[in-house]
Regions:
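P-loop/Walker A NTP-binding region and its immediately flanking N-terminal helices
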Residues: 1-163, 169, 173, 183-190, ...
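Short, polar/flexible loop-turn hinges at active-site or ligand-entry regions and domain interfaces
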Residues: 175-179
C-alpha cells in the first residue's frame, strides 16, 4: 500500500511550516532561547496546527524529545479522570536529559469537557516549572477563558490559493504526476477553501484512480 501523501510531505521542522508566519517567527525565538509559553493554536481544519506543534517540539527539544514529549488526543481522552491521572502524572514527573521542560500536546482540545479543562488549568499552574502545554483546536470558544489567558494564542489561517498551488504542484512533481493542468489545479483549490490537508488527500485519490480533479470534486460532494 502506498504511503499517504499527507504523512510523506508533512513538515517536521518550523522551516517547513507555511502560511502561519506569526507563529513561526515567535516559535523560532523560543527555540533559540530554549523557552516557550503555553500555546493555543486554533483555526479551521487542514491548516497545519498539529504539524506546527510537532515541528516546534522537534526543533526545541531535539534529541531530548524522547521521554519529554507526549501527544494526547483530547477529543478521545476528554474526561476529567484523564487530566487527574494521565496528564498530571506526565506533568509532575522528572524530565529527562537536557530538556528544559516536558511538552504535552493536547490535540483537538475543543472536545474536552469543561470540568476536565478546569482541572487542566490547575495542573498547568502547579507544574509550570516542569511542563509546557501546546493545545490545538478548531473552535477557540470551546476553550475556557482561564486556559486561554494562560497561553499565547495563535490563529491559523486558511492557506492562500497561490501558496496552495505551489505546494500541490511541488508534490505532483515529486510524485511524477504530470496530467493536471494549472487551470484544473486552480479550480480544485477554489473548492478546497484553504484546507491543505484535504487538498493533498483528494489529489492523491484522484491521481491513484485516474479520475479528473473535477470528477474527484463532484464525487466528494455527493
Amino acid at each position: 500500500m502506498s504511503e499517504l501523501w499527507t504523512e510523506k510531505y508533512r513538515p517536521t521542522t518550523l522551516s517547513g511550516i507555511v502560511g502561519q508566519s506569526d507563529f513561526v517567527l515567535d516559535a523560532e525565538h523560543w527555540v533559540v532561547n530554549r523557552n516557550m509559553p503555553n500555546v493555543i493554536l486554533y483555526g479551521v481544519a487542514g491548516t497545519g496546527k498539529t504539524a506546527a506543534a510537532i515541528s516546534l517540539v522537534n526543533d526545541l527539544l531535539g534529541e531530548d524529545k524522547q521521554g519529554n514529549f507526549f501527544e494526547i488526543n483530547a477529543s478521545d481522552d476528554r474526561k476529567l479522570e484523564t487530566v487527574r491521572t494521565k496528564i498530571k502524572e506526565i506533568a509532575s514527573t522528572k524530565r529527562l536529559g537536557e530538556a528544559p521542560f516536558k511538552i504535552i500536546l493536547l490535540d483537538e482540545m475543543d472536545g474536552m469537557t469543561k470540568d476536565a479543562q478546569n482541572a487542566l488549568k490547575r495542573v498547568m499552574e502547579r507544574y509550570a516549572d516542569n511542563c509546557r502545554f501546546v493545545i490545538t483546536c478548531n473552535d477557540r470558544h470551546k476553550i475556557i477563558l482561564p486556559l486561554q489567558s494562560r497561553a499565547s494564542n495563535y490563529a491559523f489561517n486558511r492557506i492562500e490559493s497561490g501558496l496552495m498551488l505551489d505546494i500541490l504542484s511541488d508534490i505532483l512533481a515529486k510524485e511524477g504526476v504530470k496530467r493536471y493542468t494549472e487551470s484544473e489545479l486552480e479550480r480544485f483549490i477554489t473548492y478546497l477553501s484553504g484546507d491543505l490537508r484535504r487538498g493533498i488527500n483528494e489529489l492523491q485519490a484522484s491521481s491513484s484512480s485516474n479520475r479528473s480533479l473535477d470528477n474527484q470534486i463532484n464525487r466528494s460532494l455527493q
